[in-house]
């Protein structure tokens, strides 16, 4: 009986392989597909390239196969684009055709199968969510309303670092205090709330759950089960943990923030003109029946990840580069002292008249792009790109990091050199006016958080350089800037200890 079962299993596997080969050949005849490594049945290219599809590995494949190539990852088609012209096609010219988002077994859990804004398919739900989120989060009015809070939070960082005797001697992990700052920046906007210190129990609970969510979602470890359905049973434990983390996070958002704001609103007479923070606008949309309670919580979910973490990564990278390039730090400090005057602390309006500071921010976002592959795109229907056929529901990755670090487009791209944005790249902006440089993407699915991230980066880096000489810890000439890439992320591998010596004015 066992022998018969084994024979049936082997026969079934053989037939499955034959069918896969036949389908592959039929598809090959029907489509003119982009080049790429030769796939094998069932597994595609997974056995060749593995799970770790980070920006540098995909860059190596682009050097071999060209500006557009195809990877067959199990049942999924993965198309990688690595040139400015093709990126323009995906993000702008054919922005509608390639405007959807791919499904992913882990992100399906964390977004309720696309009930959020960032990872939903292109269509009416996305347009509605984008509209509802834009007014309370992503307008110049919001910047002007909350920039005083950002300046206060940066000033509090400076004060706390000065109070810490370790900061000026052996150094501190500055990121920890900056993380509190970023949570306060965004929670002021969302809920008109802030956390008093790094020891706040609610802050620590929130930070831990968000960190676990980020670790689970950004890992490449689950790719095999996402790409190859027959291997998905091996992911059951992983997906169970994801579900548990998701439920705990959403319950935390609901109990401590959304419901608390509802109670406060019920005690006040709030008109549309009197809404004070983002969640009031969002709850108003819920009352009108435009969205449901789950949508409200997934909006909060998006902001916790997309706004807080990515900006924090960029701040951390900027500090690391300034520590490792003291001549650039000195030049930036000279600009701040000269144009603002010694002792005048930088404010949001000042950021527009400080060209070298802006160049430092741009260069940080170029060399250390927080989302190096942007958020993946997808075409719902068969499409054409670069003279090739792109089958429906292909995952499209734009290697924005390589666009910004390709020596064919940039002079000595491996160097951290802010001057490039004052010289040969003086007209290049972070808003996507040049398809060699897309730190926030461009087009319909671009990151609307650019309007918040740029001033927060400028204020934070400016205040730190104004008030401190930032140095590596004793015994080190530089700090470690090794990278840790993820599904949609690029952050520093080790949170470095930084010496912050106060300046006297």
UniProtKB/Swiss-Prot annotation:
Keyword Heme in record: yes
Annotated transmembrane regions: 3-23
Pathway this chain belongs to: Phenylpropanoid metabolism; trans-4-coumarate biosynthesis; trans-4-coumarate from trans-cinnamate: step 1/1
Signal peptide residues on this chain, from the entry's feature table: none
Class of enzymatic activity (EC top level): oxidoreductase
Compartment(s): Membrane
GO MF terms, alphabetically ordered: heme binding; iron ion binding; trans-cinnamate 4-monooxygenase activity
Listed Gene3D superfamilies: Cytochrome P450
Topology with respect to the bilayer: Single-pass membrane protein
Domain of life: Eukaryota
CDD domains recorded: CYP73 (cd11074)
Catalysis: reaction(s): (E)-cinnamate + reduced [NADPH--hemoprotein reductase] + O2 = (E)-4-coumarate + oxidized [NADPH--hemoprotein reductase] + H2O + H(+)
Keywords attached to this entry: Heme, Iron, Membrane, Metal-binding, Monooxygenase, Oxidoreductase, Transmembrane, Transmembrane helix
EC number, UniProt record: 1.14.14.91
Pfam families: p450
Family annotation (InterPro entries): Cyt_P450, Cyt_P450_CS, Cyt_P450_E_grp-I, Cyt_P450_sf
Amino-acid positions noted as binding heme in the UniProt annotation, renumbered to this chain: 447
GO terms for cellular component: membrane
Biological process per Gene Ontology, one example term: lignin metabolic process
Sites where the protein binds (E)-cinnamate: 213-218, 306
Cofactor dependency: heme
Family under the similarity heading: Belongs to the cytochrome P450 family.
Free-text function comment from the UniProt entry: Catalyzes the first oxidative step of the phenylpropanoid pathway in higher plants by transforming trans-cinnamate into p-coumarate. The compounds formed by this pathway are essential components for lignification, pollination, and defense against ultraviolet light, predators and pathogens.
Protein name in UniProt: Trans-cinnamate 4-monooxygenase
Organism of derivation: Populus kitakamiensis
Gene (name only): CYP73A16
């Amino acid at each position: 009986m066992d022998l018969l079962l084994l024979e049936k299993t082997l026969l079934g596997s053989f037939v499955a392989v034959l069918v896969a080969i036949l389908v592959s050949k039929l598809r090959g005849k029907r489509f003119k597909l982009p080049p790429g490594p030769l796939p094998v049945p069932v597994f595609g290219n997974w056995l060749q390239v593995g799970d770790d599809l980070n920006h540098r590995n995909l860059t190596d494949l682009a050097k071999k196969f060209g500006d557009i190539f195809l990877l067959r990852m199990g049942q999924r088609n993965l198309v990688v684009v690595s040139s400015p012209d093709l990126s323009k096609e995906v993000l702008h010219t054919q922005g509608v055709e390639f405007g959807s988002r791919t499904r992913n077994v882990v992100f399906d859990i964390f977004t309720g199968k696309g009930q959020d804004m960032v990872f939903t398919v292109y269509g009416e739900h996305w347009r509605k969510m984008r509209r509802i989120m834009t007014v309370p989060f992503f307008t110049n009015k919001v910047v002007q309303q909350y920039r005083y809070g950002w300046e206060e939070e940066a000033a509090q960082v400076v004060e706390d670092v000065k109070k810490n005797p370790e900061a000026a001697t052996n150094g501190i992990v500055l990121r920890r205090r900056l993380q509190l700052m970023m949570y306060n920046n965004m929670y002021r906007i969302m809920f008109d709330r802030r956390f008093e210190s790094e020891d706040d129990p609610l802050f620590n609970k929130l930070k831990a759950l968000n960190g676990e969510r980020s670790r689970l979602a950004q890992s490449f470890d689950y790719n095999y089960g996402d790409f190859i359905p027959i291997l998905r049973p091996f992911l059951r434990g992983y997906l169970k943990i994801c579900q548990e983390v998701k439920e705990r996070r959403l319950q935390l958002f609901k109990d401590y923030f959304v419901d608390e704001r509802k109670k406060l609103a019920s005690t006040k007479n709030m008109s549309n003109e009197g809404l004070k923070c983002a969640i009031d606008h969002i709850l108003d949309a819920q009352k009108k029946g435009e969205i449901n309670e789950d949508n409200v919580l997934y909006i909060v979910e998006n902001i916790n990840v997309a706004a807080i973490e990515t900006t924090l990564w960029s701040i951390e990278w900027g500090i690391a580069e300034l520590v490792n390039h003291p001549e650039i730090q000195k030049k930036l400090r000279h600009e701040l002292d000269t144009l603002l005057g010694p002792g005048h602390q930088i404010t949001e309006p000042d950021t527009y008249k400080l060209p070298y500071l802006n160049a430092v921010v741009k260069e940080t976002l170029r060399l250390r792009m927080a989302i190096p592959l942007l958020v993946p795109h997808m075409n719902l229907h068969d499409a054409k790109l670069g003279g090739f056929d792109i089958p429906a529901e292909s995952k499209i990755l734009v290697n924005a990091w390589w666009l910004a670090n390709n020596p064919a487009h940039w002079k000595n791209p491996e160097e951290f050199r802010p001057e490039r944005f004052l010289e040969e790249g003086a007209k290049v902006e972070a808003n996507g006016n040049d398809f060699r440089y897309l730190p926030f993407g461009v087009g319909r699915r671009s990151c609307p958080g650019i309007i918040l991230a740029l001033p927060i980066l400028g204020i934070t880096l400016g205040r730190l350089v104004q008030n401190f000489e930032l140095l590596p810890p004793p015994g080190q000439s530089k700090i470690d800037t090794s990278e840790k890439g993820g599904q949609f992320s690029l952050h520093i591998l080790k949170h470095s200890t930084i010496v912050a010596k106060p300046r006297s004015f």
